[in-house]
């Protein structure tokens, strides 16, 4: 058999302090967009023991109760007492929000006077989209499994299957792969790591048994597990203190978990708390759709797309495509197809992916368990676009 290699991806679940902050920032964005789709939002959140602070620049006609959003989001995650790491109803909430800088406003959207195709990028930057044919979601298996384990931890906590669970937790999966002429083929799961917050009464043996039975078994397909698979289940021994009590949290600290689990590449810009004029978010969404559509149309088995911007300029500065040698046609042809089928101007991304629509917890849903590879009609960038091109 071909030579194999190991690759690892991690995830954290919704009670992790950094992810709590992402969710609060996106809950604020949802509330603003729901009432005023033209809202300009750059909302950061930080948290530590008994404190949540929301700060940033927001220009909106929406009437938003920031403190209520903070408390509701914390409560829905399960932070209902100091024992679990934060008490949603009694913690201190600080709000320090100002309007968007008029300098940025005139340069980007001309104080709302520009037509959609004229709207400039909200900042400079470069974003990457990635897709691979190794899973039905066209996402890396290591990332998919780590993410699903985290989501399952939350599910069995909330439905009472494992009542000893507390909100905070982390997962990590190492997959053995072989490289099939540039495409990634998973062979087996090499290692599964879960560290989850738990209550005082449960024993380590109970934790390990429950995690295997109720979390790992339903998530990881049997064909990937064998007698050599290594399990590290709460390897530190105790994880009673968690959430913001255990560690400080900050929006935008989990950008690899939000994307491709270390595969592909990342331009460094976080997503949560940003409206669609911020290309960190909208640019990353459109290049995911481009890469996914290339792989779904079987033009390549694996694909990365990069786009870059200058502040105030609508047209991208560059678009790049690499299929890692898996393309059915040369990469320069695929690049042409990408440019012909996708409009990378921020105002047009907003329209084509319907990104100004808030409410329905739309962006809040993206803020835990990944922005990509999700089957949900609100994740419009996951829709495969039928590609049109001149076949030579």
Swiss-Prot record:
The cofactor remark states: Binds 2 divalent ions per subunit. The metal ions interact primarily with the substrate. Can utilize magnesium, manganese or cobalt (in vitro).
Alphabetically ordered keywords of this record? ATP-binding, Cobalt, Cytoplasm, Magnesium, Metal-binding, Nucleotide-binding, One-carbon metabolism, Potassium, Transferase
InterPro entries associated with the record:
ADOMET_SYNTHASE_CS, S-AdoMet_synt_C, S-AdoMet_synt_central, S-AdoMet_synt_N, S-AdoMet_synthetase, S-AdoMet_synthetase_sfam
Positions bound to L-methionine? 57, 100, 247, 278
Which Pfam family would be a valid example here? S-AdoMet_synt_N
Q: Which domain of life is it from?
A: Eukaryota
Q: Which cofactor(s) are needed, names only?
A: Mn(2+); Mg(2+); Co(2+); K(+)
- List where in the cell it is found: Cytoplasm
One GO CC annotation, please?
A: cytoplasm
The catalytic activity of this protein is classed by the Enzyme Commission as 2.5.1.6
Q: Quote the record's binding site residues for K(+).
A: 44
What GO biological process terms are annotated to this protein in UniProt? one-carbon metabolic process; S-adenosylmethionine biosynthetic process
- Summarize where Mg(2+) binds, as residue positions: 10
Identify which top EC class this enzyme belongs to.
transferase
Function comment: Catalyzes the formation of S-adenosylmethionine from methionine and ATP. The reaction comprises two steps that are both catalyzed by the same enzyme: formation of S-adenosylmethionine (AdoMet) and triphosphate, and subsequent hydrolysis of the triphosphate.
Q: What is this protein called?
A: S-adenosylmethionine synthase
